[in-house]
C-alpha cells in the first residue's frame, strides 16, 4: 500500500524554486533516504511534505494526518520532564505508547529529568521518541541522527526497523549510514531547479509583491 506519493513537485525557499519535478512513492514497510549536496533543498522538500509550506507546483498524496515530522529542532517543552513531554504528545495524538517510546530510545533512567537539563544527544533522543507516540504511519526526518553517539544511532535505526515492520514508512535526509540495507536512496541533484530564463519554474516573487497578492 502506498503511504506517500509525490508527483512533479516544485518547492521553493525565499520565493525561489530550489527543486522541481520531484516524483517518488513510498509504500508501507519501506524507507527512502534523500541525498544531495548542502543547500540543494532537502529541508525545504521535507518541510513542504510536512505541510509547513505550500509547493509551487505538483501534487502530494497521503492519508489524512499521515505524517510525523522531526525537524532540526527537537520541539521539546523545556520545563516538562522526559515522561511529561511524551505524555503531552500522546494525549494530543490519543495514543498509549509512552512506555514503548521510553524503552525504545533508552530514556527510562531519564524519565523524571526536565528536558532543559538534558544533553544535546539526550534531547535528540527524546525528540525522536515523540515519533513513537504519534501513531502516524509516515515518518519524515531531517538529519535525525545529529548529536547522537554511535549507540544512540543504533537505537534509532532499530526504532525505524520496528516502525517499518509494523507497516509504517520513513523518509529521511541524512548523511549517516543507518545500516538500513532495505532503504532506497534518492539523489536530489538531478532535480535542482533551473532558472526561469532556462525554462525553470518561476518563484512566488518573480513578479513582485503586486503580482503575488493578485
From Swiss-Prot:
It catalyses: heme b(in) + ATP + H2O = heme b(out) + ADP + phosphate + H(+). One of its GO terms (cellular component) is plasma membrane. It is a peripheral membrane protein. It is found in: Cell inner membrane. It comes from the Bacteria. InterPro entries: AAA+_ATPase (IPR003593), ABC_transporter-like_ATP-bd (IPR003439), ABC_transporter-like_CS (IPR017871), ABC_transptr_haem_export_CcmA (IPR005895), P-loop_NTPase (IPR027417). It is an enzyme of class 7 (translocase). GO terms for biological process: cytochrome complex assembly. ATP binds at residues 36-43. One of its GO terms (molecular function) is ATP binding. Keywords: ATP-binding, Cell inner membrane, Cell membrane, Cytochrome c-type biogenesis, Membrane, Nucleotide-binding, Translocase, Transport. Its EC number is 7.6.2.5. Residues 4-214 form the ABC transporter domain. It holds the Pfam family ABC_tran. Part of the ABC transporter complex CcmAB involved in the biogenesis of c-type cytochromes; once thought to export heme, this seems not to be the case, but its exact role is uncertain. Responsible for energy coupling to the transport system. Belongs to the ABC transporter superfamily. CcmA exporter (TC 3.A.1.107) family. NCBIfam families: ccmA. The complex is composed of two ATP-binding proteins (CcmA) and two transmembrane proteins (CcmB). This is Cytochrome c biogenesis ATP-binding export protein CcmA. It comes from Rhodobacter capsulatus (strain ATCC BAA-309 / NBRC 16581 / SB1003). The gene is ccmA.
Amino acid at each position: 500500500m502506498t503511504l506517500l506519493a509525490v508527483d512533479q513537485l516544485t518547492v521553493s525557499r525565499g520565493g525561489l524554486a530550489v527543486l522541481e519535478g520531484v516524483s517518488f512513492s513510498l509504500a508501507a514497510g519501506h524507507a527512502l533516504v534523500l541525498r544531495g549536496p548542502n543547500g540543494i533543498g532537502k529541508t525545504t522538500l521535507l518541510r513542504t511534505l510536512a505541510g509547513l509550506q505550500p509547493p509551487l507546483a505538483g501534487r502530494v498524496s497521503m492519508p489524512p494526518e499521515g505524517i510525523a515530522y522531526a525537524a532540526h529542532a527537537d520541539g521539546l517543552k523545556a520545563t516538562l520532564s522526559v515522561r511529561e513531554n511524551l505524555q503531552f504528545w500522546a494525549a494530543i495524538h490519543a495514543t498509549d505508547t509512552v512506555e514503548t517510546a521510553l524503552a525504545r530510545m533508552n530514556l527510562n533512567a531519564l524519565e523524571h529529568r526536565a528536558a532543559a537539563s538534558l544533553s544535546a544527544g539526550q534531547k535528540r533522543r527524546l525528540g525522536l521518541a515523540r515519533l513513537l507516540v504519534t501513531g502516524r504511519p509516515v515518518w519524515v526526518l531531517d538529519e535525525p541522527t545529529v548529536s547522537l553517539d554511535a549507540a544512540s544511532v543504533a537505537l534509532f535505526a532499530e526504532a525505524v526497523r520496528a516502525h517499518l515492520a509494523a507497516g509504517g514508512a520513513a523518509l529521511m535526509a541524512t548523511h549517516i549510514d543507518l545500516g538500513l540495507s532495505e532503504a532506497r536512496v534518492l539523489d536530489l541533484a538531478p532535480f535542482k531547479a533551473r532558472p526561469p530564463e532556462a525554462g525553470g519554474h518561476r518563484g512566488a516573487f518573480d513578479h513582485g509583491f503586486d503580482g503575488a497578492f493578485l
